[in-house]
A protein has these predicted regions:
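Intrinsically disordered, low-complexity regions enriched in Ser/Pro/Gly/Gln/His and often acidic
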Residues: 1-4, 55, 170
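A ubiquitous, low-specificity "background" feature that marks scattered single residues
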Residues: 3, 8, 37, 42, ...
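Alpha-helical substrate-recognition element adjacent to the catalytic core
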Residues: 11, 16-101
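Non-catalytic pre-domain segments flanking phosphatase-related domains
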Residues: 1-28, 176-186
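Mg2+-dependent phosphoryl-transfer enzymes with acidic/Ser/Thr/Gly-rich catalytic loops
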Residues: 45-49, 86-87, 91-93, 100-186
Length: 186
């Protein structure tokens, strides 16, 4: 039995360090990226999700370094709104069944080009954004069809530190990681 692997584009072969240093906007899907993709539906009809604290802390580090963060999600939930507010993410677009128009609108609002963005996704509806962003990322447990278009596939699964992995790498390539770590070495 043979296993066909999707063509992988590695960080350093897909983009130079200089290209990665141009990334200013980190755009995230929610279900399957910031969460493990599971949704708990309570008897009163409300939903809850589990978010990674590790991802949340790295998002705050990204913002502290001057980076912008946005969310583009296919679903609209109160849990996403609340978590985005907790993390200081004001660029939140929910209920986007077609994500590419939301991506283009977001770029107009912030005055950036696709090359200045990184997008992290996990499923089929993320393919257009992974292809369009300057740096397209698929989480470890993403759909195989998405992985074939990604510049990088994380080692960690969605909701389990995948976003933290991406942020750490970007900050290291932007030469900002060590500076941010100084506050923890006191």
């Amino acid at each position: 039995m043979y296993r066909i692997l999707w063509p992988l584009k590695l960080w350093d072969s897909a983009m130079t360090d200089n290209d990665l240093s141009k990334i200013q906007l980190l755009i995230l899907d929610v279900d399957g990226v910031l969460t493990d993709g599971g949704i708990v539906v309570h008897s009163d009809g409300t939903e809850s999700k589990r978010f990674s604290v590790l991802d949340g802390h790295r998002i705050k580090l990204w913002q502290r370094s001057g980076g912008l963060t946005a969310v583009i999600s296919g679903r609209e939930t109160a849990a996403t709104t609340i978590r985005a507010k907790q993390l200081g993410i004001s660029l939140v677009m929910q209920g986007c069944l077609e994500k590419l128009p939301a991506f283009e609108q977001l770029l107009k609002e912030v005055g950036l080009t696709p090359e200045q963005t990184a997008y992290v996704g996990d499923d089929l509806m993320d393919i257009p954004l992974v292809r369009r962003a300057g740096f397209g990322v698929a989480v470890a447990n993403a759909a195989d069809e998405l992985k074939q278009y990604a510049d990088f596939i994380t080692e960690r699964k969605g909701g389990e530190g995948a976003v933290a992995e991406v942020v750490e790498h970007l900050l290291k390539k932007k030469m900002k990681w060590e500076e941010l770590m100084e506050r923890y070495r006191v």
